[in-house]
Amino acid sequence: MMKGRSLSAEDRARLETAIGYQFAEKERLDRALTHSSARNARASNYQRLEFLGDRVLGLCVAELLFQTFLDANEGELSVRLNQLVSAESCARVADELSLHEYIRTGSDVKKITGKHMMNVRADVVESLIAAIYLDGGLEAARRFVLRHWTDRAASADGARRDAKTELQEWAHAKFGAAPRYRTDDRSGPDHDPRFTVTVEVDGIAPETGTDRSKRGAEQIAAMRLLEREGVWQKRSAGN
């Protein structure tokens, strides 16, 4: 992270090469990488871009899934979509692009740790998608999304059924009890909330999940429990 300072021309050029897009208006890229903690960032941080980028990403991935999985029903497509646009998935894209090296932050950067740091990385990816969309249009944004999500969408992990349904059936068969979900935390602005949910099954340790929706967090918690117990094969780091 770059505390307080803006992107240099060299930094900007290197990042544009990494993301595969050259900005006509360079300030769009700067804003996409400016955390709200940065000095004088009140009117120029990435939060508004993040709001738009979330929608552009969802549209592009939904279109990709619709065109790829012709026999999938709405429920399966929704499960795939939730997995692919989750904070964890977006944060992995940020890591692949080393975006953390370019985020402009303020003096309280040390407070950004753990899950919040994952959310920051995910938010920056969404704001970057919005910046590309505003600068070059939907097709430019779609090319970026397809470059980083096509392989993820095609992975075997995407074919899994609904994690909550799977956990419900497994828990009943193994323990004779239903899973219980508890919302532990809700954070973030109204337009981009983060929910942390714990799932408990009698007889085994609980698991937690964090996502932009309560249902998404429940799905992630259920998925983690299924993976931990060996019911599902754990996802590879690239998916």
Curated annotation (Swiss-Prot):
Pfam families: dsrm, Ribonucleas_3_3
Top EC class of this enzyme: hydrolase
Binding residue positions for Mg(2+): E50, D123, E126
Transmembrane segments: none
Localization terms from the record: Cytoplasm
Domain DRBM: 162-231
Assembly and binders: Homodimer.
Descriptive protein name: Ribonuclease 3
